[in-house]
């Protein structure tokens, strides 16, 4: 169960959702993406209740990537990216010049052009995430909702994917809400961090506000220390014995 909260999503900003397992992060983002029905209360987007949006008009505004991506066996990279245009022409609509332009631009922006003729299941985890992000970009939304996009990746690929998200947000003027487990990654890449605990928003602010010992203990229920990164000066959290 989630308690009421308000999230503004300005352009060119990334909001990170953090908290322990079961805190409500994925529940919240699924509600925002209309993947789960509301049991009470309401959610508004762009001045309208979510239930008032048609599926395709909503998908033209908001692109969602679940934690467990759908099966893509036997699908080429170019085919998956092209699916991002579905909200604009539907199942029976003609795939026109603008659709082709958007797909090519999306593959270029996410640097997956070289994989266009590859089967998705032959790619590494990081490469697959880039392709999924390319599909979202081809959708041409205003907002991205990303549920743990780095959870199955090693550190190098986590940084690679979050750097790409940061660049897409900055260059295309998108807003993004990203569920993350690593508070240090959130501090490095997010403009604002929302911390959930047992379905309740318990902290909200920039990295300096959230990555503080008392806040971290309240969020994760364990003692945490904080130091400064020697290069960036950003706060870094670490567990204390």
Stretch-by-stretch model annotation:
Residues 82, 97-115, 140:
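Conserved ABC ATPase "signature" region
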Residues 144-148:
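Catalytic Walker B motif of ABC-type/P-loop ATPase nucleotide-binding domains
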Residues 18-20:
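The feature captures the beta-strand-to-loop junction immediately N-terminal to the Walker
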Residues 41-49, 58:
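Conserved ABC transporter NBD signature motif
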Residues 94, 119-123, 127:
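Conserved ABC ATPase signature
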Residues 33:
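Helix-to-loop junction immediately C-terminal to a conserved catalytic motif
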